[in-house]
Amino acid sequence: MYMRDMEESAVLLGMVRYFGNDIKRISHAFKVYGFARAILSGERLPEEKALITALTAILHDIGIKEAVRKHHSSDSRFQEMEGPAVARSIMEGCGIHPHVMDRVCFITGHHHTYSKIDGPDFQILVEADFLVNIHEGYITPEAAPSVVKKYFRTSTGKDLAASLYGWANAGKSAL
């Protein structure tokens, strides 16, 4: 097993332990992680950026539990506020390098603030999260093509969206 795989596995287990029996949150994290890995395979990021992307996919919504506890809301601004501290705590327990933790925490703390996207690691996380949110019904089928057109930048993410949601037959112009 490669070091990146071991780090990802440790953080996945940390996320599962943190969420406990909250299968909805755990399942969402695994789906976003899966799509992020798929996009990563097509985009070929350097190893450290790939690790950051994968860890962020696992931990992007980790602030929900604290947001609900402290603010009685899972609103995105509270997730962004509470997420980085929880993410850092999980990663510290897994021996993740501080530089990697800092970047994961930055993205986790801004993952619904699309104007803050500043690199391919952040971009891929956003695309993977949107792919899952479309499937889970948080974005309507009518709104999905415009979301993809506005926010997707990677060719792999665009191709996945077109294939998954039936836009492939309509051609790339639908996106």
Annotate each PLM feature:
Residues Y2-M3, R17-P46, L59, I96, ...:
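Divalent metal-dependent phosphate-bond-processing catalytic cores, especially two-metal-ion Mg2+/Mn2+ enzymes
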Residues E7-K31, G63-S73:
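Active-site flanking loop/helix segments enriched in acidic
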Residues V32-F35, R77-G93:
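An active-site-proximal "capping" alpha-helix that borders the catalytic cofactor pocket
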Residues S41, I64-V68, R88-E92, I96, ...:
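Short helix-capping and hinge/turn segments at secondary-structure transitions, especially at repeat
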Residues E47-K49, V100:
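Membrane-helix interface segments
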